[in-house]
Amino acid sequence: MTTQFSVSGIELELFRYPSRQESNLQAWDAADEHLIKHLIDTEQTSISTAVVNDGFGALTAGLLSINPSWPLTLETDAKTSQLGTSQNLTRNQLSQESITWVNSRDELPQVIELVLMKLPKNLNYFSHQLNRLSHVLPAGTQVLIGAKAKSINKSLLETIEKNLGPASASLTWKKTRVITCIADGKARALPKATTWSVPEFKLQISNLSNVFAANKLDIGARIMLDNMPKGDYKSIVDLGCGNGILGLHAKQVFPEAYIHFIDDSEMAVASARENWALNKLDNPALVGEQATFGWDDCLTNMSEGFRPDLVLCNPPFHQGEAITDHIAWQMFLDAFRRLKNGGILHVVGNRHLAYHVKLQRIFKNCTTVASNGKFVILQAQKISKKAQEAEVEQAFDTETPHPQSALYGKPKA
């Protein structure tokens, strides 16, 4: 993995998050370089700037390298982006004092004079972000959007004009272009959440714009709903919860359980919270909060005493636009570490991802619960053995380059 970022005289060391990933993926792309180069070429001054969708801090670190006190507002929906940016700033000895951190639903500051933005994969979410900016940007404010050249077309420029102001694209550099949009000062209506029903499970679902499966039940979730685990579970985690549908149905099946919804996307966590309230799933026979909602990097920051007896998991295999299996690895390892002895990890995934190999390595057991032509449901049980637990704990050592390194031996040089 390349970690040395170099453009227009700026030199940085940047890592993806978590930094122990063992992959060929790097923490930035050429569009990040193009945006920084554009600012330097145009001699941009250090005015109040919003940085939107900065994957792991390349843009933020670049700006602070130009001026350590550049006033910045950082917007992201991904907790791993926030954590990765913070780590990279610390790694490069750049102060965070001039930064205001916001998620994609927080109120934006009224004084923004420039916007730097990376084009996200989800164009509905992109439109939502442009609509948000239209509420705070005065007419004439410049918005610079970095993207792969192949992603930029007439339709995209029309979308930008419709939601914020007229836009044009630069010449291509390293297969990327910078779109310059000039805000027209007209506030657009913010999009409403998409709502739909799952009548066979008597559930109503509401999705915000950056949540997977925006307006229908995805195939993986459906097979999972049809094949919930058997048992008597009291503490259940919906890990990578999305809109929360697995956890919602788990509460229907196990009404005595407390459900914990966790996702890297703040919009997903907010959608799960809304769906819990929408479906009125609290059991009057139980005391205390029956559902918790965490915007977090898997189970990283759960208290050490937290010991669920069931983890439901439909792992993503994308981080931004990158295809990677490290998220599944981290989910499985976190589940093993946190589950009580005898607890169950119940996983759905595409057959070609071969999750059974990973689960067998970590849990030393794996059972196929159900399958169809595309998906498979797997189940692994935590059977506590000191040597086995010690082996997995090594995978979380800060010196370990990748979550599965302790299971596979040393990474390749």
Swiss-Prot record:
Main location: cytoplasm
Top EC class of this enzyme: transferase
Residue segments, region Disordered: 389-413
Reaction equation(s) it catalyzes: guanosine(1835) in 23S rRNA + S-adenosyl-L-methionine = N(2)-methylguanosine(1835) in 23S rRNA + S-adenosyl-L-homocysteine + H(+)
Keywords annotated in UniProt: Cytoplasm, Methyltransferase, rRNA processing, S-adenosyl-L-methionine, Transferase
Pfam families: MTS
UniProt similarity note: Belongs to the methyltransferase superfamily. RlmG family.
Protein name: Ribosomal RNA large subunit methyltransferase G
Originating organism: Shewanella pealeana (strain ATCC 700345 / ANG-SQ1)
Organism taxonomic ancestry: Bacteria, Pseudomonadati, Pseudomonadota, Gammaproteobacteria, Alteromonadales
